[in-house]
Amino acid sequence: MQESEELAGQSAEAEDRAARLTRQDWLDLALKTLVEDGIDQVKIQSMAKKLNVARSSFYWQFESREALHSAMLDDWLRKNTSPIIERAMRPASDIISAVINVFECWLDETLFDPTLDMAVRLWARRAAEVRAVVTEADGIRVDALRRMFLRYGYPAEEALIRARTLYYTQIGQYTLEDFEEPAVRFSFGPAYLHIFTGQQPDAKHRAHLARCIEEKYFAPRRAREAR
């Protein structure tokens, strides 16, 4: 009798845990697993075990594994594409200041998560439907940058090439895992601005860039270390 009561209590506790789990809980775990272990390890049974719930509770939130995959891609698009578009559209006094605004995405991983981006690209190599989503996202990002250059008077073809250069350079660094020491990387900032825009940054631009690096890169890291 006591044993059956204990089992009933455990079952009720498990059901309570499952009821408290949200769609976002499953999605967060799926994205974390994608980044750490790849898409093959994004399995319903494995995730249910990590969450300490029954496999069936997954279906309270998603119709299928494919529905989860779709939600993962939607989340990636929201996290890694929308901020680029917003920064590219943000008003600025000149093109150098506009590009510094875009640099915020490369400095702040809450605006652009490079590990998630690379994980999705690896997934895309194995799934044509994912590759189509990635290709479309790349096109949207480049087009936002192209329109940014157009606003500052660049000819159409030059605006496209500069947009591609700005975007492909950064994605290429992530793909190659070319992670220099921050001090070294940031020391090249003014030169990158010159290459990307064809214009020399002045003291005002250098101060803007330094402020951006401090606020978006160093300050958040110091805050995390102080906790």
Regions found by a protein language model. Give the residues of each.
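Hydrophobic alpha-helical connector segments
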Residues: 71, 85-119, 163-166
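Alpha-helical bundle regulatory/interaction domains
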Residues: 2-13, 89-107, 139, 200-203
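Hydrophobic/aromatic-rich alpha-helical bundle segments in the mid-to-C-terminal region
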Residues: 152-213
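Helix-turn-helix
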Residues: 25, 33-71
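Amphipathic alpha-helical packing segments from all-alpha helical-bundle domains
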Residues: 113-118, 128-165
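N-terminal intrinsically disordered/low-complexity leader segments
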Residues: 1-21, 202-227
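Short, basic, alpha-helical segments at the C-terminal edge of helix-turn-helix-like DNA-binding modules
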Residues: 43, 74-81
